[in-house]
Amino acid sequence: LPIYFIQSLFEATNLEDEQKEEIRTLIANRNFFGVEEILDHYEIADQVKEAFHQLPELTGGPEILADAGRIAPGEAARLAVERLRQIYDLLKIYGVEDHVTFDLSMSGSYGYYTGIIFRAYTYGTGDAVVRGGRYDHLLEKFGKKTPSIGFAIILDELMSALDRQKIKVETGHRNLLVYTDAT
């Protein structure tokens, strides 16, 4: 998925983790010129450099998936693109395809995502109101080995978007008592 696509690009560079993290940060900040500068300092295959160079163009509707498939530097990246096509076909069944945009430069900022990463936006805000993704190893840190997918609703962004859209939310007050047996 998006993260598999970009991870395959990173793996193809054979760079150290420190350089990969620097590139990941530059991509997250949409500084693709900085990415090119770093890549130019290392011996990296032209196909991989070209794939990184094309990343800013790999944002949009389903038409970008064909481009991504053409520049994919390896089998893992091609499989990720094919899986995104399959997910898009499922979303079409639910009639939401007009609300889907792909961004193959997304890699997540927490480092635990292992599959698809997604964000949800609404009118009146440029920031995501929902962020989530798949993480196969996160729950191992809590004693349970199981793949998972989850999301967070960013309440500040959601409330800001509702306010900008002039949607009033009735609020009430409730008393809440939380008890835990600290044994």
Placement of each model-derived feature along the sequence:
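Short terminal or interdomain "cap/linker" segment that borders an active site or interface and mediates
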Residues: I3-E36
